[in-house]
């Protein structure tokens, strides 16, 4: 079908259930927006919001989106539909006053038929009410409104329905690949039609094969057609070499093109088993995975393609080769980016089934909605080579019951029926699955470990209550819990019907499961970040262990305070305003890598050079709160003014056998690495701190920190040219760097950002997890020496001029070119 971007020229206003009367009385404030648009990020945060820390104290609400458009006379009699990739939470879609649909899954794409309700050659009004007023619902920051793109689809008398072209790799090797291509062809004609289907497959713009089929369609008939091809010397898709092809299928009547469908795909084979793990094209791949939520940091939930691409690129550069879409179906832009960068995907169905975790979550609708959600999910994912696993649920409350086991079986079977080329799993949490057995299990745990304190914090329910309790279940006690016979009994029902056994925070079971299920692969679907050394050792030593997914790869909004270091006696999971982010990602909210990211990279075997990190010296002698999701409150910095002569705790992370630390050229000793870490106590003296790694007595890498001198503000944009499409975005990092390139992470600065020209200032903010600053205002204070501005292109060509003022005095400017949009 012909696709038209339908994101421009919308208006949005706040609703309260009486929108028509408010509009009549003039009591509303209407804003013109270009989708995607997250309304929640523009709300004022309050300590008393119903969502509490779960959304970072952002409230929900009702939002009314409207768009006027003209339907050409040429559309009359043709199939016309609208595709909404994501509207949170409940969406009511009206066209010219007619209710077209009510969608209850805020993370699932949905399509509505528009043709019968259009006024051809006249003005039409499309209205979407996005209702996120029933709170709390999801256990994290959700966003509100039409936060993903909208497309208009127009067919012809014979057309190819959306997502019905499927390309399957049957065999692949160095010399050839065998492909099956199937497509659904639909007639909207009242007479018999004779058409030709022309298939072209291209690699980097060059056709590698073409084919044609003739087809007869009777009035209203739908037919499935099949092609089979042998591709010579294919460029296979893999995480290391993510080669992509494009399939173009045209519907021709003579020389006239009635329709076309362009599909990006990769040629690759996939298998998962207990003997070899995950194999892509016959080669074993261990999954170094990152769990991620769907927000884009200071942008909120708005799914800008450039934001999704940036996030995946940064995760890949940090050493991850896989992501888990937690805990809902991934958006199309995210999957496109994963295809391009070679990042494998575990796509996830839902955080709940039929038992609620929050009063107004998806459990209210799951039973009547899950099948169509799976159908849409598979249709969306099928041609993405990055997608290898479907996860049917996360920490499901009823997983340990007979009814839960039966639901698990139904879900897995449905995925297999719709897509037999991929594999199923379920992210099982022992505390949730134990059910009625939990009291007896915990009794045994407490008798084994009698001196352990009870859970603290946990105000507000949802994530806070669960996470607070889970924080006790780590280390030796967690392993005892994980391997308890009653827990084995509870998990067995769901494990039996999944292709891959998925375990959340049950490291003690990673080896045990192979004894219990010798023919099943096992995956750490969610694990504690600081346990990476132990976790990856298990992955490397056991073929049945296919990988590990850390929680989390990228910091995110909501579940606020999970990883914040409290030095004032505060407890994590206690809904402490103004905490806003979880603060537990390997990458912070702006995408900067934190020290644990470099430790992980060394553990993965991807980094030879050592890395240095220093505990924050302003916290010397203080004791902080601690949860298993927290690593260390450290920075890669040797700039600590005012702390001269005080002792700094310095970590060296390295895959070398030994490291030697030098301060201003003087050796502080050589030490053997223990679990990829060596720790030194160093009197802080400005200058140069250098770590040198040795393996077999030979130097195999070094890393140096220097004290920043007279750091000046710098502006660095990730791109200097945008398309004038209303959606392209540039991410501008604002830092303070000296003449030698050393960043000052210590000194704080107050920034004001101004924009003129062919774009808008979409967001300004820092990675500070606890701040009352808004992201939709032009002012921010730096955190760890950094702040970021997101610039979004307008719809006209020109230039964007960005001016940043620091501390009401120093200014820097940056120019970004906005070119006429392609197409």
Where are these regions (language model features)?
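Short flexible loop/turn segments that cap and initiate beta-strands
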Residues: 193-198, 239-246, 647-649, 655-657, ...
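Accessory beta-strand-rich segments of carbohydrate-active enzymes
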Residues: 2-19, 36-43, 54-161, 189, ...
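Beta-strand-rich binding/interaction modules
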Residues: 95, 176-216, 225, 648-666, ...
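Active-site-adjacent substrate/metal-binding segments within catalytic domains
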Residues: 41-71, 75-83, 88-104, 157-166, ...
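Extended acidic/polar, glycine-enriched regions
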Residues: 119-121, 182-273, 683-686
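Edge beta-strands of extracellular beta-sandwich domains
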Residues: 260-265, 697-709, 811-819
